[in-house]
Amino acid sequence: AIGKWHLGLSDRTGGQDWNGFITPGPSDIGFDYSYIMAATGDRVPCVWVENQRIVNLDPNDPIEVSYEKPFPGEPLGKDHPELLTKLKPSPNHGHDMAIVNGISRIGYMKGGKQALWEDENIADSITCKAVRFIENHKDEPFFLYVGTNDAHVPRWPHPRFVGKSGMGPRGDALLQFDWTVGEIMGALEKAGIAENTLIVLSSDNGPVVDDGYADRAVELLGEHRPWGPFRGGKYSIFEAGTRVPMIVSWPAQVKPGVSDALVSQIDLYASMASLMGKPLEEGAGPDSRDHLDAFLGKDLKGRDYVVEVAGSLSVSDGEWKYIAPSNGAAYAKLTNIELGNSKEEQLYNLKQD
């Protein structure tokens, strides 16, 4: 497991001891190696965790983290904007607490100065670790999870990408993501295993343009519509929040094409188990369904329906989508996204509405 994790570390939420072996973690759920972010790019602690220990941590400068109150003497973004030498937060998003690498974050931290990452090097770190893993395991079957951080805030790409997109840091970060994918593909080809490697590229949610930092992403978006023809975006129960890109590549088995088969990322678990001929243990992955043929382009239908529960309940069969009543907000002003919540039942024909 390499890159953005955001699945939690330790069983003490908000009370982790970051200065030793952090458990539970990736090794407790089957990963033999991990090099991951402790949380997300916009949250403290801003450090790499390799095999559940913080990288480059000086034992004489231990890390302390709090999401409740600041540490005396540690400057905050909201109080010291002059220290925000790279990015400033958008108003009212909450990214105005601890300052790391000239960017303020969510949460408070002190210590660990030697272990702190530099945002402009995050993509290089993830890519180098992924390529090295491929090189070291090219002669044996392997599973590699790579979670990129490029589109996630704060967007501060490496200088070699800055200004190349004409769309500011967000556009430059997407070019950086494209480079990462190319480097990983190149490593597979160099190792001679690209033809028989199954690659799944997808996103964990729909797009959000302004998600907490004043990077001019909205201003420089131009006519580009990252949400396509759909309503909503990240945080939304509408299609732009729940329908995400997915590219499956396996040259030895998958023919090029486009499929509208209805699947869920949750189905990858049962489907990959089926591919390996290993039935799931009783009680494992109860929501996961074996739709291997849909992922491989052999079944163009997929699921009969998919359910999402994320504040609101929705059920879709690919043609119709039902959204249950909810008391949640209908619109997120800070991110300019329709959330899809309504006190009334909603039913949409996805091909006509």
PLM regions and their residue ranges:
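Catalytic-site neighborhoods of secreted/periplasmic enzymes
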Residues: 1-112, 324
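Short glycine/proline-rich turn/loop motifs
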Residues: 104-115, 159-164, 249-253, 351-352
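Anion-binding catalytic surfaces of enzymes that hydrolyze or transfer phosphate/sulfate esters
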Residues: 85-154
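The substrate-binding groove and active-site-proximal loops of carbohydrate-active enzymes
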Residues: 112-124, 163-176
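C-terminal cap/loop subdomain of S1 sulfatases and analogous C-terminal strand-loop tails that border
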Residues: 13, 19-41, 56-57, 207-215, ...
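Active-site His/acidic residue clusters
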Residues: 50-53, 128-172, 208-210, 214-217
